[in-house]
């Protein structure tokens, strides 16, 4: 994401308002090379990683779940932002000259807001889906059609939020160069501009992060506190360990997003408090570093999936099997694990009325098996119904599939 808040002309006032001065932000060649290498890492890692994530989900039928469709949307938004905006924003920040014309100036300021909105609200949808599956397992789940409708609505809202910044973007010719800037309607104290920037910051950072944090906190506490009375088997402890891994993964995802984007939003809100800070020469290096950190958020999710989820790890190994230092692994596991689980589920379904209810809950969440937390409703329901040790053991056998996948 680039000019989500003030445009570069607002960030570096002298490049658009003082045409008689030379460009004080010109960098030595060695600095440009280092920054170019750093931004290249983001583009390559993000585009390749997120494309592989989309392939893993869309090319394997058992991976096409409600949650994973949101992950596809998240991966698409992040890969698109890395591909279409990172390099352009880097060259503009380094040279302070716009080479790409009026249309791309508007797109350059418009698309990042839409992409970040789609990304964070895809994460929010995943958090809500997790919350409902674990805290309210008997409530109806989203269908595939409803999931696609939600994704469509997310993008419509994203485009509407981004429209003003794209609409008011324009290019202006200065002596010796062209700049891309945002010309907001004139109003005392820049009221429209401030209101829009604050609104964007709240909607694409603070509000969704608050919702995600609450949902995952409740889910994490519920998972951590869940116990099965009378069952102290090794398999039970494996399940507890798997649940803790899921909680750690949630914390990693949320904290990664928060850490990457917080400096960016603070940086672009500071002009309203101390505008003189942004005419200092060192501010360009600060801006490049903060923008790199924010843009790097697009490349971390594939790494997190690969490290913390067995199915994604298998998919990545297969995608990069041509590399001499990567073993292909059990690629058939992407499909076969679900088949084996269906057989286990069938045996559980026939045991008793109580276990019929339990297996129905598990069956409703079978499509989420690859992500782990969906195993929780079965164990939680088992605790609340006070089932016997034999019932608990039977349930442990079926839900151990989830534990094995997250081990």
Swiss-Prot record:
What does the protein in this record do?
This is a receptor for the tachykinin neuropeptide substance P. It is probably associated with G proteins that activate a phosphatidylinositol-calcium second messenger system.
Q: Which InterPro entries match?
A: GPCR_Rhodpsn, GPCR_Rhodpsn_7TM, Neurokn_rcpt, NK1_rcpt
Bias (Polar residues) occurs at 376-407
Its protein name is Substance-P receptor
Q: Which cysteines are joined by disulfide bonds?
A: 105-180
Q: Please give the start and end residues of each transmembrane region.
A: 32-54, 65-86, 107-128, 149-169, 195-219, 249-270, 284-308
The family classification in the record reads: Belongs to the G-protein coupled receptor 1 family.
PROSITE patterns cross-referenced by the UniProt entry: G_PROTEIN_RECEP_F1_1 (PS00237), G_PROTEIN_RECEP_F1_2 (PS50262)
Q: What's the subunit arrangement here?
A: Interacts with ARRB1.
Kindly list the GO molecular function terms attached to this UniProt entry. substance P receptor activity
The segment annotated Disordered runs over 365-407
One Gene Ontology cellular component annotation held by this UniProt entry: plasma membrane
Lipid-carrying residues in chain (S-palmitoyl cysteine): 322
Compartments reported by the entry: Cell membrane
Q: Which residues are glycosylated?
A: 14, 18, 89, 189
- Parts of the chain on the Extracellular side: 1-31, 87-106, 170-194, 271-283
Q: Which domain of life does the UniProt lineage start with?
A: Eukaryota
Report keywords, A-Z: Cell membrane, Disulfide bond, G-protein coupled receptor, Glycoprotein, Lipoprotein, Membrane, Palmitate, Receptor, Transducer, Transmembrane, Transmembrane helix
């Amino acid at each position: 994401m680039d000019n989500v808040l003030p445009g570069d002309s607002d960030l570096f006032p002298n490049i658009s308002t003082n045409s008689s001065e030379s460009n004080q932000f010109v960098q030595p060649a060695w600095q440009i090379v280092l920054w170019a290498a750093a931004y290249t890492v983001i583009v390559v890692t993000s585009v390749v990683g997120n494309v592989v994530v989309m392939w893993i989900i869309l090319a394997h039928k058992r991976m096409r779940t409600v949650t994973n469709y949101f992950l596809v949307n998240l991966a698409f938004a992040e890969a698109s932002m890395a591909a279409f905006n990172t390099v352009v924003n880097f060259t503009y920040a380094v040279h302070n000259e716009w080479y790409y014309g009026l249309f791309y100036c508007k797109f350059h300021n418009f698309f990042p807001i839409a992409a970040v909105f789609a990304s964070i609200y895809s994460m929010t949808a995943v958090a809500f889906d997790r919350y409902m599956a674990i805290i309210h397992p008997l409530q109806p789940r989203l269908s595939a059609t409803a999931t696609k409708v939600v994704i469509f609505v997310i993008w419509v809202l994203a485009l509407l939020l981004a429209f003003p910044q794209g609409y008011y973007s324009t290019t202006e010719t200065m002596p010796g160069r062209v700049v891309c800037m945002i010309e907001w309607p004139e109003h005392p104290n820049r009221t429209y501009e401030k209101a829009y920037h604050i609104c964007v910051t709240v909607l694409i950072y603070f509000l969704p992060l608050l919702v995600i944090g609450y949902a995952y906190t409740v889910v994490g506490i519920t998972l951590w506190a869940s116990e099965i009375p009378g069952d102290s088997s090794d398999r039970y402890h494996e399940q507890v360990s798997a649940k803790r891994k899921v909680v750690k993964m949630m914390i990693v995802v949320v904290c990664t997003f928060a850490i990457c984007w917080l400096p960016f939003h603070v940086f672009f809100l500071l002009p309203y408090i101390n505008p003189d800070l942004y005419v200092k020469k060192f501010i360009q290096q600060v801006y490049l570093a903060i923008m790199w950190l924010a843009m790097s958020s697009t490349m971390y999710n594939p790494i997190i999936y690969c490290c913390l989820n067995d199915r994604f790890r298998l998919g990545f190994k297969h995608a990069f099997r041509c590399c001499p230092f990567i073993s292909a692994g059990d690629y058939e596991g992407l499909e076969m694990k679900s088949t084996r689980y269906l057989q286990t589920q069938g045996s559980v379904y026939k045991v008793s009325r109580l276990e019929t209810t339990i297996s129905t809950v598990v069956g409703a969440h079978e499509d989420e098996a690859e992500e782990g937390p969906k195993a929780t409703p079965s164990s939680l329901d088992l605790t609340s119904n006070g089932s016997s040790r034999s019932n608990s053991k039977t349930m442990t056998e079926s839900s151990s599939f989830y534990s094995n996948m997250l081990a």
